[in-house]
Regions:
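Post-signal peptide N-terminal segment of mature Sec-exported envelope proteins
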Residues: 26-46
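N-terminal segment of the mature soluble domain
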Residues: 40-95
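C-terminal motif of bacterial Sec signal peptides marking the signal peptidase cleavage site
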Residues: 13-16
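Positively charged n-region of N-terminal signal peptides that target proteins for export
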Residues: 1-4, 56
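Extracytoplasmic
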Residues: 38, 78-82, 122-127, 155
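Surface-exposed short loop/turn segments
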Residues: 85-140, 146
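A short, structured loop/turn motif at beta-sheet edges
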Residues: 35-39, 74-79, 131-139
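C-terminal/domain-edge helix-coil "capping" segments
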Residues: 18-32, 118-126, 133-141, 146-191
Length: 191
């Protein structure tokens, strides 16, 4: 049964790559993140006056699909992770960090690592996706498209899906317990 599950994942990965063009992305993370302990998520909605740069059905569906693929269950009731996104039409200056690859840092378990800030000049058409730890009330991961191949066309659904997939490909953590349960989402999750 476990082999069948592995073959199914490989098949899904192969078919999902059809029509997919990886975009150059960068990501940063918090050394306070509990990346192996998250099970649930929800997408943040802008409060008050609607911010059109934070609302896009194609981006939301792509995020939902990717997070569910990684085994996360969407819930409005005290999710472990809150996911937000923002589309930047204009160029901007952005603060990032020079960090080891996230998998390397998690594997080594170093807690006394210092942040090494870097300034980025991003041109127009940048997509930013952030993951917040609800309990810690802090951003624990952010991924953003870079402008090596030009700006993202926010009116092109295929380009938007590719941008989301490219960004969230850098977040490589399965939901806690997902793999151990053979890829089955737990019916009862503790918050």
């Amino acid at each position: 049964m476990k082999n069948l599950y592995i073959y199914a994942i490989v098949l899904v990965l192969c078919t999902s790559c059809l029509g997919y063009k990886e975009m150059p992305v960068e990501y940063d993370y918090s050394y306070k993140g509990n990346f192996k302990k998250y099970k649930t998520f929800d997408i943040m909605k802008p409060s008050g006056t609607a911010d059109s740069s934070m609302m896009n059905a194609t981006i939301e569906r792509s995020i939902l699909s990717r997070m569910k693929f990684l085994g996360y269950r969407q819930t409005e009731n005290k999710p472990h992770l809150l996911v937000s996104f923002k589309m930047f039409e204009d160029s901007m200056k952005f603060n990032g960090y020079n960090q080891p690859e996230i998998e390397q840092w998690v594997q080594e378990g170093k807690e006394d690592v210092n942040y090494d800030p870097k300034k980025l000049d991003l041109s127009s058409g940048t997509l930013l996706i952030q993951l917040y730890d609800r309990k810690q009330n802090r951003s624990i991961w952010q991924g953003y498209s870079t402008d090596l191949y030009g700006a993202i066309d926010f009116n092109d659904k295929r380009t938007l899906r590719n941008a989301v997939i490219s960004i969230l490909d850098k977040y490589r953590f399965w939901a806690e317990g997902f793999i151990e349960n053979g890829g089955q989402q737990q019916s009862e999750l503790s918050n």
